[in-house]
Amino acid sequence: MSSEFISKVDKEARRKAANILRDKFLNLVEQLKKGEPLVMEIPMRTLSNAIYDEKRKLLLLGEKKLRRNFLDLNEAKRFMQTVLMASIIYDALVSDEYPTIRDLYYRGKHSLLLKSIEGNKIVSEENTWDEQKESDSVIVDIEVFTSLLREEMLILSKEKGKVVGNLRIRSGNDVIDLSKTGHGAYAIEPTPDLIDFIDVDAEFVLVVEKDAVFQQLHRAGFWKQYKSILITSAGQPDRATRRFVRRLNEELKLPVYILTDADPYGWYIFSVFRIGSISLSYESERLATPDAKFLGVSMGDIFGNSRKKPYLSEAERKNYIIKAKDADIKRAEEIKNYEWFKTKAWQEEINTFLQRKAKLEIEAMASKGLKFLAFQYIPEKITNKDYIA
């Protein structure tokens, strides 16, 4: 690849990641020189090692570590896989390449032949890895071991989130105006830290779970009317979207509101944005947005409560409500026991759901009319601070 087309930001990111990766694994060489056994200490990525920091409102990785010993027959293969993958990633960095996680799987996949002591007979044959989930897990191990996100190592993944609004950014060598995307939107790139924010004219960020609702709000001109940055995660958010939202909040000081379906899966999407996820707790400090607010759709929006009237009439509730399934009930009961859902407001929300056994999609609010959703429901809830923090 010709380096003349690579931006300075990109080159600096490569240099930094390559240096950290090299130095971390050179420590293994030093162990060998000293005659010490080859050992890697990697923080454990388990639920038991995920700790909720109440003060910082973040789900963080605990201090438990696993020791990966090359001389341990149970760990030798995983040790080999980790070193192999690190070598492939390092080569890609210094060669100005942009591998995907699928590329890395294929680049490292080959057979290892174990020969007899005499060297004239193959005793056994084993693949470096058989399935991509193996190599993906190794990449995560390297992230935890080096404290480098895969995005920082210029490893690409499929773009998922989209954004539109009065914001100009620099990506690579180009300046992109996110207010001039027509009926479309800017796809949030898998390396959001390489984006520079040039200027912004917005008062808040609205993240919408559903892509279809995002498109409706975009075409209705919601972000123009209310000077906002409109984003969709298109379901469960990917890492790039979470990091982009975090940067908008942290660097541009824009409040963040999350709009999801009124069900346990929508609540969890909100919590992933706000405090992080259990599986990626090692990344929460860079991906989560502790200041994010749950705008809705809430049980109070559907049924009302002592503080507010419902947005839906009895007839509308009858038409729009979806009966919760057993899986929904089970998920709600699980979420209810998570430390970060034990606030008074969230316990009330979850208990109402369990009592009513009812859920609602965002589209139901749009069924009352797009103007209702865009120009009454959302702005009214923001103005009245009708959200769960």
Swiss-Prot record:
PROSITE patterns: TOPO_IIB (PS52041). The keyword RNA-binding does not apply. Its EC number is 5.6.2.2. One of its GO terms (biological process) is DNA topological change. Not inhibited by the DNA gyrase inhibitor novobiocin, instead inhibited by eukaryotic topoisomerase inhibitors such as m- and o-amsacrine, ellipticine, and the quinolone CP-115,953. It comes from the Archaea. Optimum temperature is 70-80 degrees Celsius. It catalyses: ATP-dependent breakage, passage and rejoining of double-stranded DNA. Keywords: ATP-binding, DNA-binding, Isomerase, Magnesium, Metal-binding, Nucleotide-binding, Topoisomerase. The active site is at 106 (o-(5'-phospho-dna)-tyrosine intermediate). CDD domains: TOPRIM_TopoIIB_SPO. Gene3D superfamilies: 3.40.1360.10, Winged helix-like DNA-binding domain superfamily/Winged helix DNA-binding domain (1.10.10.10). GO terms for molecular function: ATP binding; DNA binding; DNA topoisomerase type II (double strand cut, ATP-hydrolyzing) activity; magnesium ion binding. One of its GO terms (cellular component) is chromosome. Residues 12-162 form the Topo IIA-type catalytic domain. Mg(2+) binds at residues 209, 261. Its cofactor is Mg(2+). InterPro entries: Spo11/TopoVI_A, Spo11/TopoVI_A_N, Spo11/TopoVI_A_sf, Topo_VI_alpha, TopoVI_A, TOPRIM_Topo6A/Spo11, WH-like_DNA-bd_sf. Relaxes both positive and negative supercoils and exhibits a strong decatenase and unknotting activity; it cannot introduce DNA supercoils. ATP is absolutely required for DNA cleavage; the nonhydrolyzable analog AMP-PNP generates nicked or linear products from a supercoiled dsDNA substrate. Generates staggered two-nucleotide long 5' overhangs. The enzyme is covalently attached transiently to the 5'-ends of the cleaved strands. Belongs to the TOP6A family. Homodimer. Heterotetramer of two Top6A and two Top6B chains. This is Type 2 DNA topoisomerase 6 subunit A. It comes from Saccharolobus shibatae (strain ATCC 51178 / DSM 5389 / JCM 8931 / NBRC 15437 / B12) (Sulfolobus shibatae).
